[in-house]
UniProtKB/Swiss-Prot annotation:
Name by which UniProt lists this protein: Endoplasmic reticulum chaperone BiP
Subcellular location: Endoplasmic reticulum lumen
Residue ranges, annotated region (Nucleotide-binding (NBD)): 125-279
EC number: 3.6.4.10
Physiological role: Endoplasmic reticulum chaperone that plays a key role in protein folding and quality control in the endoplasmic reticulum lumen. Involved in the correct folding of proteins and degradation of misfolded proteins. Acts as a key repressor of the unfolded protein response (UPR).
Residues that hold ATP according to the record: 36-39, 96, 226-228, 292-299, 363-366
Origin species: Echinococcus granulosus (Hydatid tapeworm)
Family: Belongs to the heat shock protein 70 family.
Region (Substrate-binding (SBD)): 399-499
Database matches in InterPro entries: ATPase_NBD, BIP_NBD, Heat_shock_70_CS, HSP70_C_sf, HSP70_peptide-bd_sf, Hsp_70_fam
Catalytic activity field: ATP + H2O = ADP + phosphate + H(+)
Length: 651
């Protein structure tokens, strides 16, 4: 690697940094989060090994779904996904497919057509619009991702019994700068300091390679999830994980395979019944739920039935689906996964026989046809089977989190990642002048001297792009800034040094200096149209805290209501029991208690949206009637037990 190509490459020897006890910042327990398109997963390095943490439903993966019920209650994870078919317009998902993108991006526009919720344009960003209680509210994808991250944080805290404030979060290797920045912003909104953003295939390689650090191997990681696809080629040598090449598609995954099935059955229904079910969001979401189940079934079976009660206008739906039909409908998408594989092989300069192991990651790699295509491409080589495709990324993130926080027993791990796209600036004629080629190891720094294009030019505009095309118009614009106050001089004479610096998270800082005057200007690329402002982040943090408070209030209201309901029915049942309390009270006393209990029950039926304080007041009223009567039974005996939220049988 010549000095002219890469200047100042700093290898990320995180082990050395983390083991340096003097001056090491204390982060507490650092968690690793795989923030997925369809499912997310959280892990922690503890007691010498990784623990993948189950949620409150006992599931080790949590749906990346957020929903708002009719009374404004917020649901996240399993609870949100479970009510998708009954509340489609207020159930948000796929934030990862929208995060860091322009509203007018063709992929975004394609997705909007199939979402049951509204997506609106706000400052050229896609905002997800739902009904929250009595008002409509738009959420940035960062906010929705933050809600999912806050759920993962909550899951970890419940398991660890302590507050968690720092995390390592994974992103697709092919995420661009704006998408990485937006993911960090989501962490901040969720109350997490994201210490490191690492690429998903790299995390998976750590999970795979943790036990195989003594041998040098070339590993190809094929990561096909719910919404994104990455291929990375790494070398592992004595605990050093070096990414050699990476490629992929940030808009390809299991959801696209589901959509092909939905389109197929929609056409089939229209042909048989003459009706278009796409006009009914609930029908489409019912179909989506069932085709996703069928897709999973077809990974182990050759055929299945799609059966839906009351799909559309009261009619049931029942159709067979074979694995062969599923493969035929998705044949082009399945085959398109091999293009990035070819790309990384070409970029790395390795032959197929040089690959020691193929690691399949992501739920979509369970599809037999995908496994077959990968195996055939590598001349019959079997992929590694001993790794859980759903948990591998979170596992690797947890190991990296352990390394950063200085946990013992993580071993001598060094992670050398790469930037996925070429970075450069626009020069005269719209030419893309490359400063940092793709697949350069990060962190890295590169400088180059430029000059003015006209005599006495007082200002130069530095326009920053990422991409592989020779002209900037075909690449992805990141941002621009001006260097002003250049003294009058003939064109070509001033020396303007432009420096690109990429940090360990793959985030770019560009600076320019007039070598004659020492005047400087710089930009941390945040693509104003694609990234939320610090003020917006602060507002979203406050909103997140407000929602957290609201969640607590809703939970308290439900608990107090349940207490009142339980008390009322329990008292009614006890006074009816002649063998127990009912046999010790007079008819008038029984009637007084029953009337009070009935009044409380009727009040609850008439006031379903009552506040917590109202329920407490009603409970106090009921207790004030019951307690004096019941107390008489205990005169001269031990005092009665207090009336609890769940009344004992002998009041």
């Amino acid at each position: 690697m010549g000095l002219s190509t890469y200047v100042g490459i700093f290898l990320l020897c995180i082990l050395t940094l983390s083991r340096c006890k003097s001056g090491k910042e204390e982060y507490g327990t650092v968690i690793g989060i795989d923030l997925g398109t369809t499912y997310s997963c959280v892990g922690v390095f503890k007691n010498g090994r990784v623990e993948i943490i189950a949620n409150d439903q006992g599931n080790r993966i949590t749906p990346s779904y957020v929903a708002f019920s009719g009374d404004g209650e917020r649901l996240i994870g399993d609870a949100a996904k479970n009510q998708l078919t009954s509340n489609p317009k207020n159930t948000l998902f796929d934030a990862k497919r929208l995060i860091g993108r322009d509203y007018h991006d063709k992929d975004v526009q394609g997705d909007i057509k199939r979402y049951p919720f509204k997506v609106i344009n706000k400052n050229n960003k896609p905002y997800m619009k739902v009904q929250v209680g009595s008002e409509e509210k738009g959420f940035a994808p960062e906010e929705v991702s933050a809600m999912v991250l806050s759920k993962m944080k909550e899951i970890a805290e419940a398991y660890l019994g302590t507050e968690v404030t720092h995390a390592v979060v994974t992103v697709p290797a092919y995420f661009n700068d704006a998408q990485r920045q937006a993911t960090k912003d989501a962490g901040a909104i969720a109350g997490l300091t994201v210490l490191r953003i690492i690429n998903e295939p790299t995390a998976a390689a750590i999970a795979y390679g943790l036990e195989k650090k003594d041998t040098e191997k070339n590993i190809l990681v094929f990561d096909l999830g719910g919404g994104t696809f990455d291929v990375s080629l790494l070398t592992i040598d004595n605990g050093v994980f070096e990414v050699v090449a990476t490629s992929g598609d940030t808009h390809l995954g299991g959801e696209d395979f589901d959509q092909r099935l939905i389109d197929y059955f929609v056409k089939l229904y229209k042909k048989k019944e003459g009706k278009d079910i796409t006009k009914d969001d609930r029908a489409v979401q019912k179909l989506r739920r069932e085709v996703e189940k069928a897709k999973r079934t077809l990974s182990t079976e050759h055929s299945t039935m799609i059966e839906i009660d009351n799909l559309f206008e009261g009619k049931d739906f029942s159709e067979p689906l074979t694995r062969a039909r599923f493969e035929e409908l998705n044949n082009d998408l399945f085959r398109s996964t091999l293009k990035p594989v070819m790309k990384v092989m070409e970029d790395s300069g390795l032959k197929k026989e040089d690959i020691d192991d193929i690691v399949l990651v992501g739920g979509s790699t369970r599809i037999p046809k995908i496994q077959q295509l990968v195996k055939e491409f590598f001349n019959g080589k079997e992929p590694i089977r001993g790794i859980n495709p759903d948990e591998a990324v979170a596992y690797g993130a947890a190991v990296q989190a352990g390394v950063i926080s200085g946990v013992e027993d993580t071993g001598d791990i060094v992670l050398l990642d790469v930037c996925p796209l070429t970075m450069g600036i626009e020069t005269v004629g719209g030419v893309m002048t490359k400063l940092i080629p793709r697949n350069t190891v990060i962190p890295t720094k590169k400088s180059q001297i430029f000059s003015t294009a006209a005599d006495n030019q007082p200002t130069v505009t530095i326009q920053v792009f990422e991409g592989e095309r020779p002209m900037t118009k075909d690449n992805h614009f990141l941002g621009k800034f001006d260097l002003t106050g250049i003294p009058p001089a003939p064109r070509g004479l001033p020396q303007i040094e432009v420096t690109f610096e990429i940090d360990v998270n793959g985030i770019l800082r560009v600076s320019a200096e007039d070598k004659g005057t020492g005047k400087k200007s710089n930009i941390v690329i945040n693509k104003e149209t694609n990234r939320i402002t610090p003020e917006e982040i602060e507002r979203m943090i406050q909103d997140a805290e407000k929602f957290s408070d609201q969640d607590k209030q809703v939970k308290e209201r439900v608990e107090v209501r349940n207490d009142l309901e339980s008390l009322a029915y329990s008292i009614k049942n006890q006074v009816k029991d002649k063998e127990k309390m009912g046999g010790k009270l007079s008819d008038d006393e029984i009637k007084t208690i029953e009337d009070a209990a009935d009044e409380a029950i009727k009040w609850m039926e008439n006031n379903p949206q009552a506040e917590t304080s109202d329920y407490k007041k009603q409970k106090a009223n009921l207790e004030s009637v019951v307690q004096p009567i019941v107390s008489k039974l205990y005169e001269g005996a031990a005092p009665p037990p207090p009336t609890e939220s769940t009344p004992k049988e002998e009041l």
